[in-house]
Curated annotation (Swiss-Prot):
Residues the record lists as binding substrate: T62, N83
GO biological process: glutamate catabolic process
Binding site for pyridoxal 5'-phosphate: S124, S125, T210, H273
An example Gene Ontology CC term for this record: cytosol
Alphabetized UniProt keyword annotations: Lyase, Pyridoxal phosphate
Modified sites of kind N6-(pyridoxal phosphate)lysine: K274
One Pfam family matching this protein: Pyridoxal_deC
Protein name: Glutamate decarboxylase A
Species name: Dictyostelium discoideum (Social amoeba)
Length: 462
């Protein structure tokens, strides 16, 4: 037998992420240490930590898009170093943004979409605030011309997303929010008009209320404001918060008149990263015309040797989400968006029907006529051994994230809501219902001694 002499230790070059520092000791989480580390080790440690987040596929609480084409990942990688604000440095990205604005203007029935003004934002919240700022500046200018005081502006809304509360606080505006009632969960034309006066800068109906998924009656509110103007002479504009519905109604409910077909609608905001199917970080706001934005709010930047007007609250921000929005417009078209959202709507209807079969739930929203999803509450006389917070908590054992929360102004009413987005199949809906049924059976066999309180179990509903 031959003898071989080993000159070096063959294990000397051994390397493994989990057998090397810092994986073999506690890492510094809250202060920056002196030493550096191998990138692949840190990457693996962070990926492991992210596994503790919920499974996006089973997150039926969020409105944000979580199922993305592989092509979107490629485009996002190509745009990772593009700063959207540098329109002179990235002129083609700026051109793509402009195309998206005109596509949306056309989708939302702007009378002259080629002349429409609008912009991208970091999300629908920023877009909503820009729309609100334009309303305030327009109202203030008119009050100055009339020689009237302009120190007490107000907006009239239904049960709105938190961004409108922030807008009112940050920009010193009174928020007149129509409260929910036991027999009414959204703003009606009658309730809106009750709160309007000469200091109202605008009425803000929501196309897809976050709490119940329902659409508010934009056309009815517009007609009520027309009548109000004839009686009082007050011309009050409408800004539509279409964060979710703006990318659903044009495809699934084209018969609903809510957009620029109504002359009183001066601006609309929408979220590209919700039902626009784009990755997180893109919103849109479109105005009916240039006169609906006060000139003092607009800044000019150099663009292709000329000037481009800009209006935003942010400065540096990534361009990838805008490019991906353009990709989605080209990739899906009207027929694609219709097919995708119709499938989601059908799943929501299926879920609401299955939930109703238990006989212990009142269906607040059955999945028809508005956003894809469903919403329900326990019947007042339901003889059950759990509350909806308990049910949500039990469903988490199987990975499902379902929002349960009390309604604003109605702390005695707890609702549970599922929001259906692209990437959710009928098989997933059936699995959800199977786990839902098993959870209720579990509580029948194992009654809750101490139910989860609303403070402990309140879910994020936006």
């Amino acid at each position: 037998m031959s003898l071989h002499h080993v000159k070096t230790n063959k294990y000397k070059g051994f390397y493994d992420s989990y057998a090397s520092p810092p994986a073999t000791k506690e890492i510094s989480k809250y202060s920056l240490k002196e030493e550096s580390n191998k990138p692949e080790v840190i990457r693996d440690l962070i990926i492991d930590e992210l596994l503790l987040d919920g499974n996006a596929k089973q997150n039926l609480a969020t409105f944000c898009q979580t199922d993305l084409d592989k092509e979107i990942h490629v485009l996002m990688d190509k745009c990772i170093d593009k700063n959207m604000i540098d329109k002179d440095e990235y002129p083609q990205t700026a051109e793509i943004e402009s195309r998206c604005v005109h596509i949306l203007a056309d989708l939302w029935n702007s009378p002259e979409s080629s002349e429409t003004i609008g912009c991208s934002t970091t999300g629908s919240s920023e877009a909503a605030m820009l729309g609100g700022m334009a309303l305030k500046w327009r109202w203030r200018e008119n009050r100055k011309k009339q020689g009237k005081p302009f120190d007490k502006p107000n907006i009239v809304t239904g049960p709105v997303q938190i961004c409108w509360h922030k807008f009112a606080l940050y920009f010193d505006i009174e928020l007149r929010e129509v409260p929910m009632e036991h027999d009414r969960y959204i703003m009606t034309p009658e309730e809106a008009i009750k709160r309007c006066d000469e200091n109202t800068i605008g009425v803000i109906p929501t196309l897809g209320v976050t709490f119940t998924l329902q659409y508010e009656d934009v056309k009815g509110i517009s007609e009520a404001l027309d009548k109000f103007e004839k009686e009082t002479g007050l011309d009050i504009p409408i800004h539509v918060d279409a964060a979710s519905g703006g990318f659903v109604a044009p495809f699934l409910q084209p018969e609903i008149v809510w957009d620029f077909r109504l002359p009183r609608v001066k601006s609309i905001n929408g979220s590209g990263h919700k039902f626009g199917l784009s990755p997180l970080g893109v919103g849109w706001v479109v105005w009916r015309g240039k006169n609906d934005i006060h000139k003092d709010l607009v800044f000019d930047v150099n663009y292709l040797g000329g000037n481009m007007p800009t209006f935003s609250l942010n400065f540096s921000r990534p361009g990838g989400q805008i490019v991906c929005q353009y990709y989605n417009f080209l990739r899906h078209g009207r027929s694609g968006y219709t097919a995708v959202h119709q499938a989601c709507l059908d799943h929501g209807i299926f879920i609401s029907k299955q939930v109703k079969k238990h006989g212990i739930f009142d269906i607040v929203y059955d999945g028809t006529g508005a956003l894809p999803g469903a919403c329900w509450k326990l019947k007042k006389d339901a003889k059950v051994k759990f509350n909806l917070f308990d049910l949500s908590d039990r469903m988490r054992n199987r990975g499902w994230q379902i929002a349960s929360y009390t309604l604003p102004n109605l702390p005695d009413i707890v609702v549970q809501r599922v929001l259906i987005r692209h990437g959710f199949s009928h098989d997933m809906a059936m699995l959800l219902i199977e786990d839902f049924n098993r959870s209720i059976e579990y509580f029948d066999k194992h009654p809750m001694v101490q139910s989860i309180s609303k403070d402990e179990g309140q879910s994020f509903h936006h």
